[in-house]
Amino acid sequence: MNPYAQYNPQERKVAYFSMEIGLAAELPIYSGGLGVLAGDTIKSFADLGIPAVGVSLLYKKGYFHQEIDTSGNQIEIPVAWDPSEYMTLLPEKITITIEDRTVIIQAWVYDVKGIKGDSVPILFLDTDIEINASQDREIAAYLYGGEERYRLKQEMVLGFGGVRILQLLGHDNLEAYHMNEGHSALLTLELMDRLQDIETVREMCVFTTHTPVPAGHDRFPKDMVREVFGENFDVESLDHDNIIDDQARLNMTYLALYHSEYINGVAKKHGETAQKMFPEYRIDAITNGIHTRTWVAESMARLFDRYIPSWPNDPSALRNALNIPREKIWAAHTAAKQELLDFVNERCGLSMQPDVLTIGFARRAAAYKRADLLLSDTDRLIKLVDTHGPIQILYAGKAHPKDEKGKALIKAIHEKMDAIKDKIDICYLENYDMYRAKLLVGGVDVWLNTPLRPMEASGTSGMKAALNGVINLSVLDGWWLEGHIEDFTGWRIGRRQRDEGEEPENSRKKDAADLYAKLEDKVLPYFYENREHWLDMMAYNIALNGSFFNTHRMVSQYVMQAYFQ
């Protein structure tokens, strides 16, 4: 029997394409928020019984294992893992043409089981087949590895190959092809080749953009596209509607926009930003969410089970968290905090204590996220501690191997850590992954987020923290513009928006000053002197933000607004 037949491909209605999908720490095929969002989305598909199928690439050499040396330099170590331990290799194979060579593609299927027993299969495409040329076997080896040409080949495998494998496996009744960012935009060309009708293709295509600035969108030189696509593809046919830009580059975002009936940003503010970037298209907004069962700490889950038993099926029921006795919330949080600190103390050689205010900052180490803002004035930080009480600081995050600014940021943080370590316990946890992320969002007291506005399209780590009753201290950007109620769900850093044309360095100084003021006037006094209000804020976070910012709500919006209009 064909192992894929159990998934009833004829009944699947939604195909969800993503360059990366984060499902569990042991599967090193994601790098950050985009992939984790994709994984959480598919988990909610399964929980809600949405007849979907996922499509991505299989990165046999994974995203890297991170080590940091004593000088703060990031060291990237390839990850060896065996997909056969987690997935089933399907017998079916398809071909695409790359540089006028035939490339054979196989697929591995991973089974995502929902809470009620429904399954969503994910097809991970793989070119590591003996008959392929050596350079083609490596196409899907590394996530976000290689140069532009390598990336274009990966996107061909995902877009062209993804549609072809779906057809071969019997997915004849798909009604929606959802592109999670522009990496999979080439699927629109494959659909056009098959259907020969732009309106039919548009009715089937949904495009979610995550990038709030023009520079972040994938572009490939037209001459390179011509060479890689091969002589049978007419690149000039794409030279319309900004798909080929004024620098003769294929713009994957415009390719997806042109072919999609429904387009959305990932938060209300980001939807407005995207609408200004692409005024010729109608851009909606569906704010991101998180998969609650994946991200809630075990101790907090047990608390919810007792007081809100319907929460796993209906996260909106978490609004009833206001009725949970505050001492029970604190006990559950303390258990999660102790689990985190045990992990940290063992790895960092520290003796962090559960009664000390603990601040967490963990996310991709990109320069715009300004992870070092908290350490920009170490003298003031030490004075705060001497005056108002101790703090503990936890950092984590990988920089992309080619992101020199991100690597420099990690190094700068380590240099600042050396300056304060005698006064403040501080640790940069190596090899940030989903396991460490869950410990951190469940166990710290304050979740810090300091991006340069308006660079944060949404962000989801703060949602995970809020679900666990952890209080956010964040720049007003992305989702926090919707989740923030000052002194109730957390605190804002800086003004609502950056002044037009304001230099980043000036914005940095203002935000740093406001961050220290919030620590001095609100965070430390509330934690050490007004625990009753602190506990109320924890409950408000769960009830107001945990109940709304979840992928069950998000997926329901996609179903109603995008997939089955």
Predicted regions mapped to residue ranges:
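Catalytic cores of carbohydrate-active enzymes across secretory and cytosolic contexts
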Residues: 1-565
